[in-house]
Structures are given as structure tokens and as C-alpha cells.
């Protein structure tokens, strides 16, 4: 009898609540509750990600609108206020490059400004609603490409065009200063030449050699102010070259910073996605173990 009772005790389950209906219901509720908590956390993460994208789109549009308005206004003022010297022959292609660069700069920034003006009110209206589910009413997800295009035009392409605009304005403004005067003297028609009377006695006293010397000698042309006589370029050309020499390394620094910034941003996003995937795989392993 003792042995039988021992055998019966050994055959009893370790968790007696498993055979009871109440115990099995409690276990199922525990698993179900854990699943709901996991799904709720996932939904919360998706909603938080949507709100983050909304705020990021709003910040990009605000920055694009401010930058585009400032730079396009500067380009228009530069084109209107620049004074061209009519008696100076500009290098070939300089005025064409200045006009084309200014036009493209204004067009690019006006496009970014138009996108910001059209999308920003709708995003602002949704972001001011204190409701977590209202994020889906914003058009920033559907028009994400236009937001990125406006951001790229305003910050990347628009900035490089602005640097080129500064260089061209320097050339157009400073090149005529102190430039050598290579224009030929104007030809006066014979009908406008006043008659000159010379006495015969004075003409007879002049020898042929002295007359030729008198006709060939002309007063020397004065050099332009602040220019060394005999030099091919004036101080204006030197000032334009100085601005170009300064702006070229600045443009290279801008390009290097832009590449480094976007590379670091992509690396940061990649690390964040890896961490999220590792967390999901860990949660999946815990659920499978349960």
C-alpha cells in the first residue's frame, strides 16, 4: 500500500492547476495579455514614428521656406541693383552666366517656397490637434517626395547656386574698375571739322622733319586710377580673382560637410533599424519560449 501510494504520488502532475479549468483559463489569459501588450507597444511605436515624420516634414518645410525666401530675394536685388558699365567690354559669356545663374537660382528657390507654402498649413493644422489618431489626416506621408525635393532644392542645389551667384556678382561689379582703355578714338567726320587757317610764312618756316614730328607726337594716355602702367589687369580684376579664390575652397568645404552629414545620418538610421530588428527578434524568441 505504501508503495502504491508512492507510485500514485509520483504520477501526479507537478502543477495541479493545469488539470483544472480555472488554471488553464488563467494561463491562456496570461499569454493573451502578453500578446496584446506586445501588439499595443507595436502600434504605439508606429504611431510615434508617424508623428516623428510629421514633425520632421514640418521642420524641413519651415527651414526651406525661410532659406528660399532669403536667397531668392538676395538674387533679385543683386540683378536689379548691379550697375553695368556701358563703355566697358565684359569678358564673353560673363553676362550670360550671371543672368542664367540668377534666373535658375530664383526659379529653384521659388519652387521650394511654393511647396512649403502649399503643404505647411495642412501639416500645421494636424500637428495642433491634440489627438494621437489625427496624424493620419496629414498629407505629409503621401507627398513625402515633394517635401524632400523642396528640402534638397533649398539647402543643396540652392546653396551652391548662391555661391556661384556671389562669384559672378563680384566679377560683374569689380572687373570694370581700373580696366585698360582699349577702345579706339572716335572718328570725326570731315564736315564737322572746323576750318583752320595757317599763315604761309609760318608754314614755310617749318622744315619737313619738324612738321612730321609735330604731327606724330601725341600726348600720352593716362593710366586708369590705381593701376600700374603696362599691366594687363586692373585692381577690379584682382578683387574678382580674390573673391573667386576664397569662394572655391568654401564650396568644397560645403560639399564635404554635406556628404559627411548625410553619410552620418544614414549610418545613424541604419543603427536604429538594426536595434529595432534585434529587439523584435528577442521578443519573438521570448514568445516562442513561452
Curated annotation (Swiss-Prot):
Reaction(s) the record says it catalyses: Ca(2+)(in) = Ca(2+)(out)
Pfam family, one: Orai-1
Membrane-traversing stretches: 63-82, 95-115, 157-177, 239-259
UniProt site (Confers selective permeability to Ca(2+) ions): 81
GO biological-process terms attached to the record: store-operated calcium entry
GO (cellular component) term, any one: plasma membrane
Residue ranges of the region described as Disordered: 1-21
Cell compartment(s), UniProt: Cell membrane
Membrane topology according to the record: Multi-pass membrane protein
Keyword terms of this UniProt record: Calcium, Calcium channel, Calcium transport, Cell membrane, Ion channel, Ion transport, Membrane, Phosphoprotein, Transmembrane, Transmembrane helix, Transport
Reported regulation of activity: CRAC channels are regulated by fast Ca(2+)-dependent inactivation (FCDI), a mechanism that limits Ca(2+) influx and cell toxicity. ORAI3 subunit displays prominent FCDI. Inhibited by lanthanides such as Gd(3+) ions.
GO molecular function: store-operated calcium channel activity
Residues bearing PTM Phosphoserine: 42, 45
Chain's role: Pore-forming subunit of two major inward rectifying Ca(2+) channels at the plasma membrane: Ca(2+) release-activated Ca(2+) (CRAC) channels and arachidonate-regulated Ca(2+)-selective (ARC) channels. Assembles with ORAI1 and ORAI2 to form hexameric CRAC channels that mediate Ca(2+) influx upon depletion of endoplasmic reticulum Ca(2+) store and channel activation by Ca(2+) sensor STIM1, a process known as store-operated Ca(2+) entry (SOCE). Various pore subunit combinations may account for distinct CRAC channel spatiotemporal and cell-type specific dynamics.
Record-stated family: Belongs to the Orai family.
Subunit structure: Oligomerizes in homomeric and heteromeric ORAI complexes. Native CRAC channels most likely consist of hexameric ORAI heteromers, implying that diverse ORAI1, ORAI2 and ORAI3 subunit combinations with distinct biophysical properties can operate in a cell-type specific way. ARC channels are heteropentamers consisting of three ORAI1 and two ORAI3 subunits. Interacts with STIM1; this regulates channel activity. Interacts with CRACR2A/EFCAB4B.
Protein name: Protein orai-3
Organism name: Rattus norvegicus (Rat)
Amino acid at each position: 500500500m505504501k508503495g502504491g501510494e508512492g507510485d500514485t504520488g509520483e504520477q501526479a502532475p507537478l502543477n495541479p492547476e493545469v488539470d483544472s479549468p480555472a488554471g488553464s483559463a488563467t494561463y491562456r489569459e496570461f499569454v493573451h495579455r502578453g500578446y496584446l501588450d506586445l501588439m499595443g507597444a507595436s502600434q504605439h511605436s508606429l504611431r510615434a514614428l508617424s508623428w516623428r515624420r510629421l514633425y520632421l516634414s514640418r521642420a524641413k518645410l519651415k527651414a526651406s521656406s525661410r532659406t528660399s525666401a532669403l536667397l531668392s530675394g538676395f538674387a533679385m536685388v543683386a540683378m536689379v541693383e548691379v550697375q553695368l558699365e556701358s563703355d566697358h567690354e565684359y569678358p564673353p559669356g560673363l553676362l550670360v552666366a550671371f543672368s542664367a545663374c540668377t534666373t535658375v537660382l530664383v526659379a529653384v528657390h521659388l519652387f521650394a517656397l511654393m511647396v512649403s507654402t502649399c503643404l505647411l498649413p495642412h501639416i500645421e493644422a494636424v500637428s495642433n490637434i491634440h489627438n494621437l489618431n489625427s496624424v493620419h489626416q496629414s498629407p505629409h506621408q503621401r507627398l513625402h517626395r515633394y517635401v524632400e525635393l523642396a528640402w534638397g532644392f533649398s539647402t543643396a542645389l540652392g546653396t551652391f547656386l548662391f555661391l556661384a551667384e556671389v562669384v559672378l556678382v563680384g566679377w560683374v561689379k569689380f572687373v570694370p574698375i581700373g580696366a585698360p582703355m582699349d577702345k579706339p578714338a572716335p572718328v570725326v567726320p570731315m564736315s564737322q571739322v572746323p576750318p583752320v587757317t595757317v599763315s604761309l610764312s609760318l608754314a614755310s618756316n617749318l622744315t619737313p622733319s619738324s612738321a612730321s614730328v609735330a604731327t606724330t607726337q601725341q600726348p600720352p594716355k593716362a593710366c586708369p586710377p590705381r593701376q600700374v602702367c603696362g599691366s594687363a589687369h586692373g585692381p577690379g580684376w584682382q578683387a574678382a580673382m580674390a573673391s573667386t579664390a576664397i569662394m572655391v575652397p568654401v564650396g568644397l568645404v560645403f560639399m564635404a560637410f554635406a556628404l559627411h552629414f548625410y553619410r552620418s545620418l544614414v549610418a545613424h538610421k541604419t543603427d536604429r533599424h538594426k536595434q529595432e530588428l534585434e529587439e523584435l527578434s528577442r521578443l519573438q524568441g521570448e514568445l516562442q519560449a513561452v
